[in-house]
């Protein structure tokens, strides 16, 4: 979710192209998840291990506003129990641009089952609320499916260089 914004619905103030203050509605988790990919490429390596890659580009652009380009690649090796997500986010605008990015998805069996783990280069992990705080010690390990499960959300702060790049 994101890219310009990735939080709860609300209002945001900004300076318009005429220099006046403007206001816009912020949608739940931003716009990017509702924008279809404009370019999708599927490749399969011809030699072992025959890695499969799906790569796509999504543009979040607004007239007199953000011009963000996101390339996402998901890859896996047939028969493996892992996959990799690799993103490249580029500001195509003429001005610096803030961005937010949330990774959340609803995967099920056989990809995620009880005991599956999330491996991340995390400097810090913080629970989103008091409910999540009760499960912070096992933030990286998935439990079994449970009827009526109340979501448990953690903020992952990845290691970054001096410029904030992760």
Model-derived segments and spans:
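Generic detector of well-ordered alpha-helical packing
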Residues: 87-88, 105
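Short, hydrophobic/aromatic beta-strand segments
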Residues: 95-102
